[in-house]
C-alpha cells in the first residue's frame, strides 16, 4: 500500500514542479500560520498531509518516513513524522519543540509553525504563534472543544492573530456525521464570541486520509465550503508590516577607528515599523531632541529609504548623544515614554509567579529591571471571566499585571504595534524566560 502511494506521489510531483516553474516564486505573497489545539488532535499529521498532498517534500524525506511507518507496523504513511524531528517526539508520537516548515503552491508561499498541544509546552505554542498571520485550531471530532482548545484560541486572540481556521479533525472516526460537526461549531462559536477575532472559519477534515485537506471529499458531500488548502491560498491577509508608526530602536553606536571615517557616527538597528527616508526629521526618545537623517547605510551601501524588517545604520545631521535603547520616531507620531507598564502576561515559568521576586524586562533593545506593582486579575480560560479573587499565577496562566521599570521605556500598545508593544520577563535568579507580555 505504501509503495503504491509513493509511485503515485512521484508522478504527481513532476506535474507540480512543472506548474511551479511557470509561476514566479518571488512574486507570491507569504502567509505565516501556526497550528493550535490539544495533544493528539492531529496537528502534525495535518501539516504532514498538507506537505505531502501539495508535493512539497523531497523523495528522500518521503522514503525515510515510509520506512519509519513500516517499522511501526503501519499500512499507511505516518505523516506526523514529517514534522516531529526530535527523538523524543518520534518515540512518544507527540510534538515538543516548535517545528517550522516551508512550502509553496503556485498561488502563495507558506511558513508553518507546528506547535505542541501538551499543556506543559504552551510556552512553545506562544513562541510559534507570535509572528503568525493565521491560526489553524484543530479539534478532535470525538472530544469537541476542550480547555486546551480554548487556551490556544485565547492566546491567538491576545497575539492579535486576525484569522482563525477551525479544522474539525478525525471526522472519519465519527462516520463523517454532519450533526456532530454542527455541535462542535456551535460550541466553539459560543466560546469565540468573547474573543477579539473577526474572521473564524470552520472546515471538517480527516488529516489521516486527506479528506478536505487539499482535495474535496465525497464522504463530506454535505459540506459546501472550501478545502483547507484553498482557504489558505485565498484568504486575504493584510500586510504585517506597520508602515504608519516609525520606530527605530538603537542597537549599537558605530564609531569606526580609521582615518577615512574618523568623524563618522552611525546608529545601527532594525526598522521595527514605518518608513525612514534621507532628509526626514526625526525625534529622539526619551530626550525629545529633533534632528534629520543624513544618510542610511544598508550592507555598506547608501540607500535613500529603509523599512521593516531592514537592519540598517542611520547617520544623523546633528551630533547628539545617543545610546542603545534610545529610539528614533517621527515628531508627530511618538511612542509613549513611561516607567509604568500595564500588560497581559502569559506565565511560562515552571514555578509560580512571585510578585516579590526580581525580574528583568526585555523590550526592543532595552534591558531593565522592574518591580511588580500589582496583579489585577487572572483569566479563567473556560469562561474568559476575570478572576479577581484568586490572584496566584502558575504555569500557563494568563493575567493582567502592572510593573514599574528602573528607567523609562518607549512603547505602544500591542494592538497598535507588535514590536514595541511586546515584552519578555526574565527571572534574575535563574536567567530563564518566564513570561511573555502584551502591553495594553
Regions found by a protein language model. Give the residues of each.
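C-terminal effector modules of nucleic-acid-centric enzymes and ribosome-associated factors
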Residues: 32-36, 173-176, 180, 190, ...
